[in-house]
Design a protein with these regions (language model features):
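N-terminal export signals
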Residues: 1-17
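Active-site acidic/histidine proton-transfer and metal-coordination neighborhood
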Residues: 5, 91-192, 199
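Acidic (Asp/Glu)-rich catalytic clusters
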Residues: 21-26, 46-51, 64-80, 104-114, ...
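Boundary/entry segment of secreted carbohydrate-active catalytic domains
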Residues: 21-42
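Hydrophobic faces of well-ordered beta-strands that scaffold small-molecule active sites
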Residues: 28-34, 57-59, 75-80, 117-119, ...
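Active-site-proximal loop/turn and secondary-structure-junction residues that shape catalytic pockets
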Residues: 36-38, 61-63, 81-83, 123-125, ...
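Short, acidic/polar
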Residues: 38-48, 61-64, 95-107, 199-200
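Mid-chain, structured segments of secreted extracytoplasmic proteins
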Residues: 73-101
Length: 200
């Protein structure tokens, strides 16, 4: 049986100063999501991250990575393939395009020294959850050999379907765990977002 991996979204934690030295301990690694700050020019944003001691950024693609490397900011959760949140792996009609996109981006993620690559189930659009799970597994299994070869971990994000992402299929941990078990690869995991899951 596959080991089910749950990866928490970037945590928001207070980094305390050492009482003796006044220096940061450096044992908490902060990450930020780029889309939240998209109005700030990238280079200005990266400079600010350096000043704040933040070491990583989520949801960035190949066009961002060279500048991120210049400032020593790690791409903790990559994107660069797919059709967005609503159109995902649960729709077999999209598999050909999704597979093509992911097979192109997986080597780029690895060559750039990164590990994690996000994916989405897509919306239900009237589809039964069991059917959607099988569809996701059938499609994702076709990219897993390349992900395994390159050491890239494909991660499907759990999102709430009550407030922010109405009709999204991967909206419960149980469904996501079942998908991990069906795929059966250590290189497929869940991106467990505590904001979204506490709503469900």
């Amino acid at each position: 049986a596959a080991t089910v991996g749950l990866v928490s979204a970037a945590g928001v934690a207070m980094e305390r100063k050492s009482a003796n030295t006044g220096n940061l301990k450096g044992n908490i690694n902060h990450s930020v999501c780029r889309w939240c700050y998209s109005k700030i020019p990238m280079e200005d944003f990266l400079q600010s991250l350096n000043e704040l001691g933040i070491t990583a950024m989520d949801l960035t693609g190949p066009e961002d990575w060279p500048l991120m490397k210049k400032y020593g900011i790690h791409a903790s959760m990559c994107w660069g393939a797919g059709l967005g949140i609503e159109k995902g792996w649960n729709d077999p009609k999209l598999h050909e395009e999704l597979i093509k996109d992911y097979l192109q981006i997986i080597p780029k993620v690895a060559e750039s020294g990164y590990t994690n690559l996000i994916c989405f189930s897509g919306n239900r659009n009237g589809m039964n959850d069991d059917v959607g799970l099988k569809n996701c597994a059938d499609g994702l299994k076709q990219i897993m050999p390349l992900a395994e070869k390159h050491g890239v971990v494909i991660q499907m994000e759990l999102l709430n379907s009550k407030v922010d992402h109405k009709d999204y299929m991967c909206d419960h941990a149980e469904w996501g765990v079942a998908l991990c078990q069906e795929i059966g690869s250590e290189n497929f995991k869940l991106l467990y977002d505590i904001y979204h899951m506490q709503i469900m």
